Amino acid sequence: MLDIKRVRDNFAEIKEMLLTRNEDLGNLDDFENLDAKRRELIAKTEELKAERNKVSEQISVMKRNKENADEVIARMRQVGDEIKELDIQLNDVEDRFKDMMMRLPNVPHESVPVGTTEDDNVEEYTWGEIPAFDFEIKAHWDLATDLKIVDFERGAKVTGSRFLFYRGLGARLERALMTFMMDLHAEEHGYEEMLPPVIVNRESLTGTGQLPKFEEDVFKLAETDYFMIPTAEVPVTNFYRDEILTAEALPQGFAAYSACFRSEAGSAGRDTRGLIRQHQFNKVELVRFVKPEESYEQLELLTGHAEKVLQLLGLPYRKLKMCTADLGFTAAKKYDLEVWIPAQNMYREISSCSNFEDFQARRANIRFRREPNAKPEYVHTLNGSGLAIGRTVAAILENYQQADGSVVIPEVLRPYMGGKEVIAPK
């Protein structure tokens, strides 16, 4: 959520910046009227409450002096009725105002390129050599099926489209990647490991920004107010919801492995085959809580941690700085890492690394004190995929495929695969 005072004091500038985001701004133009009405009602209510307190004291004095207080008592009742009526109006305005603020996206950072489509994203650099093949390459879904390490058909039979079974060395590869990533982030990058719940309440999804605007994108448990998480970012960020941290506790980072669940409501017809877009997938997520003045330095650090996974796996990738129209709802600045997928002859997203500044912290009420008695300030939150495991499997299968249909296992994963070097056709 945006800082109300910042929007109030810089409305025209904030509106102009938000319009570059290619997001639905809802009833933003009502901000000034609603804000003024809200402040007017608050002032009137406080004025009447002060009068009620004064009249109450006056009645006490009159009763002690055995004076007739009927008129004053009648006035106090009238004031009480006026306060009740104003409270009803104020609650209505507050609800409308809060709903509007909850649906406004974050303000882009000044370093974010202005753009209208994904074509305006800026490529920072590429890493690694794109492999050259002297044979006809296969898509990862054909490789996985031929090697009998993923079963798409039975996943669809048991559940539905965009579900699958990993089996044999496919299940082992998925598990190896998870353990490798968690070891790297915990032992070398200094993150604390976390295994979060995969079901959260409405407050948690509101805190990280998925609700109320994007409820159709998440799976809701019937007849409850519980949801399946779309990413571990949700439970891990909400770990500190409604808490005040010490300055010494910052910066703080968590690496969390979890299953993720997404309805892909807006993705009909896209990536209908393979591992790129599943309703259920596993991911390692990096979340950081930092002081405001450190957050952009921390964004570079976090992005580097995600890049290190790709580098150690020997997977070619590129780093994109996302333009204003492709930031998503919550980010002030975002980098995407895209891994090379040979069969598609293109880079595909495998990680998004974002600085939300205090946008999530305001929604989730996560604060810190610089000194023991100092006024609490909002932390800045960051997160990034470190990495999405299914897409990493797809990239390994395609980039490491051999002419005989086998797939070489990246060297860094072999200790996690029992020393096995190749996944070969049976």
Curated annotation (Swiss-Prot):
A GO molecular function held by the record: transferase activity
Residues reported to bind ATP: 262-264, 349-352
Localization: Cytoplasm
Enzyme Commission numbers on file: 6.1.1.11
Keyword Transmembrane attached: no
Residues where L-serine binds: 231-233, 285, 385
GO biological process per UniProt: selenocysteine biosynthetic process; seryl-tRNA aminoacylation
Signal peptide: none
Pathway: Aminoacyl-tRNA biosynthesis; selenocysteinyl-tRNA(Sec) biosynthesis; L-seryl-tRNA(Sec) from L-serine and tRNA(Sec): step 1/1
Cited SUPFAM superfamilies: Class II aaRS and biotin synthetases, tRNA-binding arm
Gene3D superfamilies reported in the protein's UniProt record: Bira Bifunctional Protein, Domain 2, Serine-tRNA synthetase, tRNA binding domain
A GO cellular component entry from the record: cytoplasm
Catalytic activity: tRNA(Ser) + L-serine + ATP = L-seryl-tRNA(Ser) + AMP + diphosphate + H(+); tRNA(Sec) + L-serine + ATP = L-seryl-tRNA(Sec) + AMP + diphosphate + H(+)
Keyword Lyase among UniProt keywords: no
InterPro entries named among the record's database cross-references: aa-tRNA-synt_IIb, aa-tRNA-synth_II, aa-tRNA-synth_II/BPL/LPL, Ser-tRNA-ligase_type_1, Ser-tRNA-synth_1_N, SerRS_1_N_sf, SerRS_core, tRNA-bd_arm
Entry keywords, A to Z: Aminoacyl-tRNA synthetase, ATP-binding, Cytoplasm, Ligase, Nucleotide-binding, Protein biosynthesis
Enzyme class: ligase
Entry's family note: Belongs to the class-II aminoacyl-tRNA synthetase family. Type-1 seryl-tRNA synthetase subfamily.
Subunit and interaction comment: Homodimer. The tRNA molecule binds across the dimer.
Domain notes from UniProt: Consists of two distinct domains, a catalytic core and a N-terminal extension that is involved in tRNA binding.
Function per UniProt: Catalyzes the attachment of serine to tRNA(Ser). Is also able to aminoacylate tRNA(Sec) with serine, to form the misacylated tRNA L-seryl-tRNA(Sec), which will be further converted into selenocysteinyl-tRNA(Sec).
Name recorded for this polypeptide: Serine--tRNA ligase
Native organism: Lysinibacillus sphaericus (strain C3-41)
Source lineage: Bacteria, Bacillati, Bacillota, Bacilli, Bacillales
